[in-house]
């Protein structure tokens, strides 16, 4: 298992540069999650990636999809900025007039997938209630009452919660590393306990150093 885990860490580190702690945390959970595929019940895992934009959160979600399902395109992405209004939850789940909800329909078509929910804190409270049901029960009913199972999905949420507090305490490149408790506290203060407690792991992403940014630029240029 350790060998498998170290191979996975190496593989993910090639995809996501400069985030060793995040890569290690996700590797642990992915190894467990892969063993839970085809288990009935809850999703195989739920992660919350916290940190500034442009530091590798989406890349790590794609790498997770590739590891679990053999294809980085097995990623169903939802930007919660687009689900801020009352009625947003109905769009995701489905209504009598449009029974195929955006989320339920996507998962019915592709039941083995990573579901990436960007900027989770922006979603309407009713949307968060829908996600709470997914995390707790592993299923939703669409507009026609058909059950959609999430038991072969990995839920990855992203958030900027805590970024402002952290940026006030560190300079460029995180010269003085901030304890991860700052991120956890920001998330815990924002969400209701029943939602917070359903998250398997909160994974902090840190501001990239100049050296890492140059390394990323070289990788992009070489592609």
Where are these regions (language model features)?
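AAA+ P-loop NTPase nucleotide-binding core of proteostasis motors
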Residues: 1-223
């Amino acid at each position: 298992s350790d060998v498998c885990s170290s191979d996975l860490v190496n593989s993910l580190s090639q995809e996501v540069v400069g985030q060793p702690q995040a890569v290690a945390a996700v590797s642990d959970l992915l190894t467990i999650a892969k063993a839970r595929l085809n288990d009935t019940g809850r999703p195989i895992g739920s992660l919350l990636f916290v940190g500034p934009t442009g530091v590798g959160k989406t890349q790590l979600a794609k790498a997770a999809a590739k590891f679990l399902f053999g294809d980085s395109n097995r990623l169903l992405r939802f930007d919660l900025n687009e689900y801020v209004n009352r009625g947003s939850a109905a769009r995701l789940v489905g209504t009598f007039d449009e029974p195929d909800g955006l989320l339920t329909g996507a998962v019915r078509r592709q039941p083995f997938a990573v579901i990436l929910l960007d900027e989770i804190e922006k979603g309407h409270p009713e949307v968060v209630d829908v996600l709470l049901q997914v995390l707790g029960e592993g299923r939703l009913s669409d507009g026609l009452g058909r059950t959609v199972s999430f038991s072969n999905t990995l839920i990855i949420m992203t958030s900027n919660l805590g970024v402002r507090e952290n940026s006030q305490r560190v300079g460029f490149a995180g010269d003085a590393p901030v304890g991860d408790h700052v991120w956890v506290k920001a998330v815990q203060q924002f969400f209701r306990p029943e939602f917070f407690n359903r998250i398997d792991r909160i994974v902090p992403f840190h501001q990239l150093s100049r050296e890492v940014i140059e390394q990323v630029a070289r990788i992009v240029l070489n592609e």
